[in-house]
Amino acid sequence: MSLKGSKTEQNLKDAFAGESQANRRYLYFAAKADVEGQNDIATVFRSTAEGETGHAHGHLEYLEKECGDPATGEPIGDSVSNLKAAIAGETHEYTDMYPGMAKTARDEGHDEIADWFETLAKAERSHATVSYTHLTLPTNSGV
């Protein structure tokens, strides 16, 4: 039975997203603990974040084989494919996701958050440009 299109594929995508978010949260918590001088707690959060990264990578390895990038659906695996998937993701973020979020925030009167989303859209465009630059380097001439 194919993984693509299955409930298991969706479960892997959901688990990847959850583990990835946990990693980022725990690193944020570790930074907060550092500011508070709670070095032992910061260490616990960093260690846990590292474990969550391993879990997320495991999910991604299963998705890589048949399903591709869980965010874009683009094939992933080798560096050229990974750059193309990154460009697709970053392009979506700066052309659709963040502009739409900024509009909603502004419509709801959250101007500071709208400004934040607009700033992030610019950053994502820069990320896409950097990835595209590396994709078109002569060392990737087989693209």
Please report, for each region that a protein language model flagged, where it lies by residue.
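Helix-loop segments that flank and shape redox-cofactor active sites
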Residues: M1-K7, A22-V44, E66-S79, Y98-I113
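Acidic/histidine-rich alpha-helical segments that form the ligand environment
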Residues: A15-G18, A22, F29, G77-Y132
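Transmembrane helix-bundle signature of multi-pass membrane transporters/permeases
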Residues: S47-A49, L120-A121
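Amphipathic alpha-helical coiled-coil segments
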Residues: G54-E61, S126-Y132
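Conserved small/polar residues in nucleotide/adenosyl-binding loops
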Residues: T133-T139
